[in-house]
UniProtKB/Swiss-Prot annotation:
Its EC number is 2.5.1.61. GO terms for molecular function: hydroxymethylbilane synthase activity. One of its GO terms (biological process) is protoporphyrinogen IX biosynthetic process. It comes from Phenylobacterium zucineum (strain HLK1). Belongs to the HMBS family. One of its GO terms (cellular component) is cytoplasm. Tetrapolymerization of the monopyrrole PBG into the hydroxymethylbilane pre-uroporphyrinogen in several discrete steps. This is Porphobilinogen deaminase. The keyword Isomerase does not apply. SUPFAM superfamilies: Periplasmic binding protein-like II, Porphobilinogen deaminase (hydroxymethylbilane synthase), C-terminal domain. Pathway: Porphyrin-containing compound metabolism; protoporphyrin-IX biosynthesis; coproporphyrinogen-III from 5-aminolevulinate: step 2/4. NCBIfam families: hemC (TIGR00212). Its cofactor is dipyrromethane. The porphobilinogen subunits are added to the dipyrromethane group.
Length: 320
């Protein structure tokens, strides 16, 4: 009998990352012909390899102060390039606009709800917070979007895993916090938010709610990778990341992008703000993809076009 392939999966060591990686792990095992409910067999053919990243170790500063989004992926990508793992599972919103040479995003599974979640010790909505209330977030985008709507609020740094952030809210260090709803749902905490932020009013981070399965470029089209792909999610994320690339997005730039499909049409909203929320630059548009030879490239082109329009209008106003 031929030897069954083994796919080693690299992931950050946090509870959320391991939960998200576990979702992909079971999908890979199924693609390899293993019962996804047989935990021992799943671990045998698709073992999880936890890797601690610099972004996990440094918790007292914003990402932009210590190197940006790549700090959540660098060590994992090194393991991928060295051959210690065969794929890596990331939150798509943590992926930099440009990937290291020789690596690629081989699959994007079905997306979770991309909205931001508002969690507080009382008020139901951002608008209901008292004047001067303390809002916790480590995201420059969330900070800018909230200050645009509520300039009287005090935005305060909030780093750490989901459990740590919720604990700080409960301890009274913050009046409210904002988290990605997708992560809460995957952790079984989807009941905690008081409300959800309308993504057309305040677009989330490009790719929020989606997972990226990264491989070596030579492994892009292996059968197990193809089995993970979700076409609607791939097209929407292509549009959002097109905007990210056009805006040269990083943790120093408050950028939101929200794409969705209506039939064969991809619709996209892109916005960028000044870090203090006083200035907001927004463009929206759509592209018909159903007749295109390469729908993913066409979706990306839509994002590039709208992102460039925002960039030309905003200039240096959106960079911290």
């Amino acid at each position: 009998m031929p030897t069954q392939p083994v796919v080693r999966i690299g992931a950050r060591g946090s509870k959320l990352s391991l939960t998200q990686s576990g979702i992909v792990q079971r999908r890979i095992a199924a693609a390899l012909g293993v019962d996804p409910d047989n935990a021992a067999e799943v671990e045998r053919v698709a073992p999880l390899i936890p890797i601690t990243t610099t972004g996990d170790r440094v918790q007292d500063r914003r990402l932009l102060e210590i190197g940006g989004k790549g700090l959540f992926t660098k060590e994992i990508e090194e393991a991928l390039m060295d051959g210690r793992i065969d794929c890596a599972v990331h939150s798509m919103k943590d992926m930099p606009a440009e990937l290291p040479e020789g690596l690629c995003i081989a699959a994007i599974p079905e997306r979770e709800d991309p909205r931001d979640a508002f969690i507080s010790r009382g008020p139901e909505r951002l608008e209901d917070l008292t004047e001067g209330a303390i809002l916790g977030t480590a995201s420059l985008r969330r900070q800018a979007q909230c200050l645009h709507r509520r300039p009287d609020l005090e935005a305060k740094l909030l780093r750490g895993n989901v459990e740590t952030r919720l604990g700080k809210l409960e301890a009274g260090e913050y009046d409210a916090i904002l988290l990605a709803y997708s992560g809460l749902r995957r952790l079984g905490l989807g009941h905690l938010p008081k409300s959800l932020i309308d993504p057309k009013e305040a677009p989330p981070a490009p790719g929020q709610g989606a997972l990226a399965v990264e491989t070596r470029a030579a492994d892009r089209d292996l059968p197990w990778a193809q089995a993970l792909r979700c076409r609607p999610t791939t097209l929407a994320v292509a549009a959002e990341r097109g905007a990210l690339i056009a805006l040269e997005g990083s943790c120093r730039t408050p950028i939101g992008a929200h794409a969705w499909l209506e039939g064969g049409t991809c619709k996209l909203i892109v916005e960028a703000l000044s870090p203090d929320g006083k200035l907001r630059f927004r463009h929206s548009g759509e592209a018909e993809l159903s007749q295109m030879a390469d729908p993913e490239a066409s979706a990306r082109d839509l994002g590039l076009s709208l992102g460039l329009a925002v960039k030309e209008e905003a200039g240096d106003a959106i960079v911290l």
